[in-house]
Amino acid sequence: MPGMMEKGPELLGKSRSANGGAKSPAGGGGSSANGGLHFSEPESGCSSDDEHGDVGMRVGAEYQARIPEFDPGATKYTDKDNGGMLVWSPYHSIPDAKLDEYIAIAKEKHGYNVEQALGMLFWHKHNIEKSLADLPNFTPFPDEWTVEDKVLFEQAFSFHGKSFHRIQQMLPDKTIASLVKYYYSWKKTRSRTSLMDRQARKLANRHNQGDSDDDVEEAHPMDGNDSDYDPKKEAKREGNADQPVQTSKIGLGRREYQSLQHRHHSQRSKCRPPKGMYLTQEDVVAVSCSPNAANTILRQLDMELISLKRQVQNAKQVNSALKQKMEGGIEEFKPPEAQTPQAPRTLGPSPPAPSSTPTPTVPIATLNQPPPLLRPTLPAAPALHRQPPPLQQQARFIQPRPTLNQPPPPLIRPANSMPPRLNPRPVLTTVGGQQPPSLIGIQTDSQPSLH
């Protein structure tokens, strides 16, 4: 209480004067019990105090805070106060090698991240066997982006751009929806340099601490060479000595503009590896950790390459052997055919098989004819223009050409006085000197049908 009174004597004086002004008949001022004089404020100040309420300090036991007795058990940690859940607590009996092996199995076989794998182990009270048996019973939440996933996404985006189908080939455990969602969050918060570039820059800054001096020289390019001394320039520099800050600002502005240009066209100035080659942070760190590490890694890669070549050669040998077997054919795998004697085929009618039902009799003329598909197509009515017999055709080409006064041979002599035709009709000889009937009088219905 004395401390509060020491801090605000003016406040106490104002409150007392306000209370005393209402009771005293003078209203202008009065003497207090302590003997000090208190002057009343104008009415405007009193009205402002009335608006904000009574500002006086309240004294008494009813206005003091009640502090309970000290209880050491009440300050213990409770889960209800924080609302969080403990997911991992290290245990001294588990060696680090065994723990790393458990985490690797959980990540590679079951898709857990490190936090989920350790949470499962802590749930089973650091029993690795029970945790490994219980890992397949749960599906981990796949929307977690580890550092490896982020680096792979940056590499894939630098190679393929916004082709999320190609990016998914490098991140097969991520869906296209999750890739698009991460792309927009990464686009807003990303810096123009990738994680690998930042890590390489940190390592370079640790080894080379002279980069800051180079930056200072770039920021002040006019403070460079002593050999480029020019008295006129020096006089101008002395005349403009009152503006050193502006020149430095201009230089910094140019650098910022160049950096902005580099940020907007960062893809052009990047040195990309060839297609099919990818860099990872672990490999770069492993190569740069010691001078002999690069040779050992290259030897391991050579051994892996040789083993892969051997596998390819073995596959080629197996394929060539299979091709040779295929060229031999499948004759040896065919089942043997039954050697049954076959009856000779006859063109005549086959003997009728004994049957109880009577079979219709087929004329012999139709059996001796060829099948319908092999029969020649003949016109329905006999043709008026017939070909001459073969003897007459041969005689036409064998006999010598007649002279002008020699009559034609009797075989091709026309029956009437009409000029000779190119294809004369054959002369049919009949028994008894009877003339053959004309072609018009032949009845086609009496002839058997060839069809």
Swiss-Prot record:
Q: What is this protein called?
A: REST corepressor 3
Assigned protein family:
Belongs to the CoREST family.
* Chain intervals with Polar residues compositional bias: 431-451
| Compartment(s) | Nucleus
Q: Where is the ELM2 domain?
A: 55-139
InterPro entries given for it?
ELM2_dom, Homeodomain-like_sf, REST_helical, SANT/Myb, SANT_dom, Trans_reg/Corepressor
Bias-annotated ranges (Basic residues): 261-273
Superkingdom, taxonomy of origin:
Eukaryota
Instruction: Identify residues that carry Asymmetric dimethylarginine.
Output: R401, R413
Residues with PTM Phosphoserine: S212, S227
Q: Which keywords does UniProt give here?
A: Coiled coil, Isopeptide bond, Methylation, Nucleus, Phosphoprotein, Repressor, Transcription, Transcription regulation, Ubl conjugation
> Which GO molecular function annotation, any one, does this entry have?
enzyme binding
Report residue spans for region: Disordered.
Answer: 1-55, 204-275, 333-451
Record location of the Glycyl lysine isopeptide (Lys-Gly) (interchain with G-Cter in SUMO2) cross-link:
K76, K249
Using the record's annotation, list all stretches that form the SANT domain.
Answer: 140-191
